[in-house]
Amino acid sequence: FPDLILGWAQERDLNPLLVTALVRQESRFQPNIKSVVGAVGLMQVMPETGEWISTQLGQDSYSLTQPADNVKFGTWYLDFTHREYSNNSLFAVASYNAGPGAVSRWIEEKKFTNADEFVDKIPYPETKGYVESVFGGYWNYLRSYDPAVRARVDAL
């Protein structure tokens, strides 16, 4: 699904390697997977979230089991979470998993001063592991596919 991910990531001004890392964590690239809580497809979009996104996009007809719709909706939501948190990918990814209300509450209550502190103090174990996994995958993709990052790593 690289062309699909790249196309929607570029359309939404998201880093395609971050989106790829998120898809890997969410579904292991299995387009028909469904979670025990009901999330669907490559980007594990919840049906209720999909309904809300469809109204935001003005798209009445869609199927979250179809990779094209799922990635379109999932990247829209990831872009939404980025806009909610001033383009902070760490907060956006945590919000993608835990919901924007939870992340806003954590930020307000904890007054985080750096990214490591935020990750260490995420109160939901699932979300903490999710953020660590997505960003671990993202870092590996950056090292493998981003020439600037690869050059800096090789220079160490």
What does each of the following model-derived ranges do?
Residues 1-156:
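Catalytic glycan-binding domains that act on GlcNAc-containing polysaccharides
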